[in-house]
């Protein structure tokens, strides 16, 4: 299969709309004033906000009106999407075609949230029944554990779940369980990912072997960090339980497809939850990897989470480009990245429950689009993936917002708020203060404050320029009604399809991650060198020096 079989161009810069956008940027884009655009067009907000309605009737408003665009720019961006055949690649993904060209795989995480049970095919096989079978297994298992029907080796109920994984097997479940903490039930969940022994050691200090269930999350069951941590957990468990391997069956489950290795580890293969090769790690929270989520919030809430994502999938596949919310988000990202030279993208949730959301999106975006070679196997002559970062606000306002407001870099930003708090304490005082900052930050970034305003407020002399805000800094405001499982599912799927749109325009494969391989290979070599006491001289002078100093101090 040709690596370029889904697109008819090698480089995005070859597309006529790209040249058109470059001319528009030079003639008006770089001097466009959002404040003036609002003055010129009383209906700008009306035209540039889009409301998504979820399967349960809840709504999320996406306000794009504070972005550096006008009707002509939006039209040219839509033209770019058409020329890049974003919809063709999208449809190929939803048909189960092998759009992961470098690994010759389908990209079918969307099939995991196909709760309508439509037939969805990969290589001629309808995968919907298998997806349903795994979900049914997850439902039965999670309900047994949560109800107390599933008991540990001494007959006690499970109270704690420890998920051991890394990358997508960790970031997704961590973020989702934190975001949906309000829906937590009877179990406490803990996550171990880092190979640093501190992570597993500190976790084992706070759990009881009689009442703890370990989930080992590794598709291949060979991931070095995960299996090392899993073996440490198993050794700890056996040391506390009389070294009887038969007890493992009640306290360990595997989220994996490698039945041989799972059985060798000692886990009963009945407690094995599989997923297919067409599920990428950073898209795996919808799969068996989400078992910790189902255990924590209950299966019904987990299903609502899936349905929220499915609703965005339906919107993405069925909505015309002009009103297609994820597509517009992706096009704006390309506009800033490739024409304004923006290198970063800020996501600031005004919601403490979403405090891990930026870290999750960081992997989604940067592992997907941190590429420099196109589907046509040529190096790009344009910038691709942005550096995505963020922290929850209002904390973020007291750390890096200074640079966003008055620094020398353009940082397009997404602000996220839920109108209804799960904790409306003090007669909603906290929520109103939070919301006032959400609205004020976006407004301040847009309108700024000029020299005349600063002087009118009493500033004089050399202090004046320090108090000037240039404004005209773009934001997208995302206002949900409430953070529910369905809302969270929708927000994640929105960003997945934003990332997809970016990658389609840049003509890169957003679904591999070859960049993680070289470091792993070198780490294996160095790992062996750390097992002996001899002085190392096989690397460059810096690496040799660091290794030898480490060995001396270890």
UniProtKB/Swiss-Prot annotation:
Any single Gene Ontology cellular-component annotation: cytosol
Major enzyme class: isomerase
SS bond partners: none
Coiled coil location: none
Modified residues (N-acetylserine): 2
Activity regulation remarks: Strongly inhibited by the polyol (sugar alcohol) phosphate D-glucitol 6-phosphate (D-sorbitol 6-phosphate). Also inhibited by the polyol (sugar alcohol) phosphate D-ribitol 5-phosphate.
Catalyzed reactions per annotation: alpha-D-glucose 6-phosphate = beta-D-fructose 6-phosphate
Annotated residues for binding of D-glucose 6-phosphate: 168-169, 218-223, 363, 367, 398, 520
EC number assigned by the record: 5.3.1.9
GO MF, any single term: glucose-6-phosphate isomerase activity
Record-linked InterPro entries: G6P_Isomerase (IPR001672), G6P_Isomerase_C (IPR023096), Phosphoglucose_isomerase_CS (IPR018189), SIS_dom_sf (IPR046348), SIS_PGI_1 (IPR035476), SIS_PGI_2 (IPR035482)
Family, similarity comment: Belongs to the GPI family.
Function: In the cytoplasm, catalyzes the conversion of glucose-6-phosphate to fructose-6-phosphate, the second step in glycolysis, and the reverse reaction during gluconeogenesis.
Family matches, as NCBIfam families: PRK00179.1
Further facts: Present with 91600 molecules/cell in log phase SD medium.
UniProt-recorded name of the protein: Glucose-6-phosphate isomerase
The gene coding this protein: PGI1
């Amino acid at each position: 299969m040709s690596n370029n079989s889904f697109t008819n161009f090698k480089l995005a810069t070859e597309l006529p709309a790209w040249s058109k956008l470059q001319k528009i940027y030079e003639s008006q884009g770089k001097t466009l004033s959002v404040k003036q655009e609002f003055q010129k067009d009383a209906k700008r907000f009306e035209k540039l906000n889009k409301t998504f309605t979820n399967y349960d009737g809840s709504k999320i408003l996406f306000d794009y009106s504070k972005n550096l665009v006008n009707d002509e720019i939006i039209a040219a961006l839509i033209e770019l999407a058409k020329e890049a055949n974003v919809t063709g690649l999208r449809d190929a993904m939803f048909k189960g075609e092998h759009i992961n060209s470098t690994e010759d795989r389908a990209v079918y995480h969307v099939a995991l949230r196909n709760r309508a049970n439509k037939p969805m095919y990969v290589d001629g096989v309808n995968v919907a029944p298998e997806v349903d079978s795994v979900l049914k297994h997850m439902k039965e298992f999670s309900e047994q554990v949560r109800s107390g029907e599933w008991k540990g080796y001494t007959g006690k109920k499970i109270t704690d779940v420890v998920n051991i994984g890394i990358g997508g097997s960790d970031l997704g479940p961590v973020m989702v369980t934190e975001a949906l903490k309000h829906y937590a039930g009877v179990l406490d969940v803990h996550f171990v990912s880092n190979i640093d022994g501190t992570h597993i050691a500190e976790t084992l200090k706070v759990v009881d072997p009689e009442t703890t269930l370990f989930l080992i999350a590794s598709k291949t069951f060979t991931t070095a960090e995960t299996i090392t941590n899993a073996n440490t957990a198993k050794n700890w468990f056996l040391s506390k339980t009389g070294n009887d391997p038969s007890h493992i069956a009640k306290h360990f489950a595997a989220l994996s497809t490698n039945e041989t290795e799972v059985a060798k580890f000692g886990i009963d293969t009945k407690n094995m939850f599989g997923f297919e090769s067409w599920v990428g790690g950073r898209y795996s929270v919808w799969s068996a990897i989400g078992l910790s989520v189902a255990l924590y919030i209950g299966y019904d809430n987990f299903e609502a989470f899936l349905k929220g994502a499915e609703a965005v999938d339906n919107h993405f596949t069925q909505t015309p480009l002009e009103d297609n919310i994820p597509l517009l988000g992706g096009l704006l990202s390309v506009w800033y990245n490739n024409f304004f030279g923006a290198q970063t993208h800020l996501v600031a949730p005004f919601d403490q429950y979403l405090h891990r959301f930026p870290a999750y999106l960081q992997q989604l975006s940067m592992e997907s689009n941190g590429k420099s070679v196109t589907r046509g196997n040529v190096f790009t002559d344009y910038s691709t993936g942005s550096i995505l970062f963020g922290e929850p606000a209002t904390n973020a306002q007291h750390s890096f917002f200074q640079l966003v407001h008055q620094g020398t870099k353009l940082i397009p930003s997404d602000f996220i708020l839920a109108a209804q708090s799960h904790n409306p304490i003090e007669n909603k005082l906290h929520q109103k203060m939070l919301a006032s900052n959400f609205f004020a930050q976006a407004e301040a970034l847009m309108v700024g404050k000029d020299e005349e305003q600063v002087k009118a407020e009493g500033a004089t002399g050399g202090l004046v320029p320090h108090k000037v805000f240039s404004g005209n800094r773009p934001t997208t405001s995302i206002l949900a009604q409430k953070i529910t499982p369905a809302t969270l599912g929708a927000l994640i799927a929105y960003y997945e399809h934003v990332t997809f749109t970016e990658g389609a325009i840049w003509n890169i494969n957003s679904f591999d991650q070859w960049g993680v391989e070289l470091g792993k290979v070198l780490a294996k070599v160095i790992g062996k060198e750390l097992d002996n006491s001899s002085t190392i001289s096989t690397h460059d002078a810096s690496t040799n020096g660091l290794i030898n100093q480490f060995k001396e101090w270890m």
